[in-house]
Amino acid sequence: MKKITVVSLALCSFLFGGDLFSVKAQIPEKFTLPTPWTEEALKAEIPLPEYPRPQMVRSEWLNLNGIWDYMGGKDLLDPVTATTPPVFPAKVEKIRVPYPPESELSGIARGGDTCLWYKRSFSVPQAWKGRHVLLNFGAVDRISSVFVNGKKVGTHTGGYDAFSLNITD
């Protein structure tokens, strides 16, 4: 299996369609606005594990929802001019994807971060060798740049638009 590291930057909220790391996002003990689904969402190893695009159903796919490394702030690398991904600190915040950083379910529970960087590694199954591998984003708000193994593979501009990038070697 080939290990892939994806780094993506989005301005505003980022939603992505993986398996869960052994680390956890910081989840509050008490929620400000709990819903009937809050407890169920917290118990899920992979949040929203169902195939997100029924019109394009696939028998083989990898859900990347779960825990990602997160960096947010106002003074981070700009997605438009970024040619390489940022270096994440050794001790980094964790975010539960697909929830936006403003959501308590994300583990971040704050707004105001204008530049958001997400990072995680995953392995492409050996059975996919020789096939096209697409990275599908369910919704990204504003501007995003996506890096795979340190190489910029694409950018996208739009308001909560879905988009795909071909990351085939």
What are these regions (language model features)?
Residues 69-73, 107-169:
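Accessory beta-strand-rich segments of carbohydrate-active enzymes
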Residues 21, 25, 45-50, 103-107, ...:
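N-terminal accessory segment at the very beginning of proteins
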Residues 8-19:
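Bacterial N-terminal signal peptides
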Residues 64-115, 167:
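Core domains of carbohydrate- and sulfate-ester-processing enzymes
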Residues 2-3, 19, 91:
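Generic short amphipathic/hydrophobic targeting helices enriched at N-termini
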Residues 23-62:
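N-terminal pre-domain segments of enzymes
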Residues 1-9:
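Bacterial N-terminal signal peptides that target proteins for export
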